Amino acid sequence: MSRRFNPLEDPPSASSSDEEGKEIARNSSSDDEDDVSSENPSPLKTTLDAVSDSESGSDEETDSDSELEKKKDQVVTNPVDVKRAKKVKTSEKSGAKRSLEVDEAAVSMDVKRAKKVSGEEEKKKSGGGGEETKKTYFQRLWTEDDEIVVLQGLIDDKKDTGVSNTNKVYELVKKSISFDVSKNQLMEKLRALKKKYENNLGKAKDGVEPTFVKPHDRKAFELSKLVWGGIRMALASGMKSNEKSKKSSKFESVKHELDSSLPNSKNNCEDEVMDEGEVSFTKSSLVRSIVGLGMDELTAQQGLSKLASKDMKRFYEQWKAMQAREFEFFLQKHGFLFEVLSKISEAFGSNA
């Protein structure tokens, strides 16, 4: 029994004709590729061929050779380098743009500063005159030498007459002053110098003269002492003036008190005498004295009005006698104090 052919178990062997067909097809495809490659050469190959052909040229074509060499270098360059070069160019452009913006900002700042400076100069030009006028107006007229001249003039005039005469002093010093001084200006300066001297005296402690930083102040102080007296004399004169004011005020208060206490004074309301010969103290100084002790006036008047007429007369006589003795006591007291103050003033004057 013959075996049946199974194509899966025993595949048929390829025939020679089939192999030849495959070989032919392979060859034809390779030929086609060669034709395509020959028809479309790559740019790199074309450039290299052109460069190689140009190298075999004559010496007259050296310029074209160098250009081709540059093209060759450009073509052969790595694409990564090209990208980097582009980035560098971009950064250079951005840097140039940034520097241009910085330059423009600097120029604008310079322009603003120039405008500001010009504006300040214009303000100075426009307002400078006023400031100079103010400085000139408040400029010191009296120099230090002028002050010494004035004090020396006072001393010289006082030596001749014993008393300073401002009219003579003005005629004496006006030609030596550094400016055209008027008499009013001289009088104001004299008052200012005296006030300054008194202020310096106030700085003295225990009779010790104050210290000065500037030699001019020391010299002016020494000359002022010759004009208005030394420290002790000034203190004595100040004490005299204070004593006079105190004495005058004290005498005024004593006078007022005595006038109010005397029965016949103008400030005192006379004691009323009743028709029956009785005395009334309702408006007398006795009522005011009682009020001074703390009792109100109405209570004092009512209390005195309730006294018997005999007591009223006795109190009236005693009150008048005490007022007379009080007046004598005040006179003795103030005479004594005046004598003491006079001796103190003489003691200060002799030690000056």
From Swiss-Prot:
Classification via InterPro entries: GEBP, GeBP-like_C, GeBP-like_DBD
Keyword rRNA processing in annotation: no
Skewed-composition ranges (Basic and acidic residues): 89-101, 117-132, 241-259
Example GO BP: regulation of DNA-templated transcription
Domain of life from the UniProt record: Eukaryota
This protein's UniProt keywords: Transcription, Transcription regulation
Sequence segments annotated as region (Disordered): 1-132, 239-269
Biased composition (Acidic residues): 56-66
Pfam families, per the entry: GeBP-like_C, GeBP-like_DBD
Family of the protein in this entry: Belongs to the GeBP family.
UniProt protein name: Probable transcription factor At1g11510
Gene source species: Arabidopsis thaliana (Mouse-ear cress)
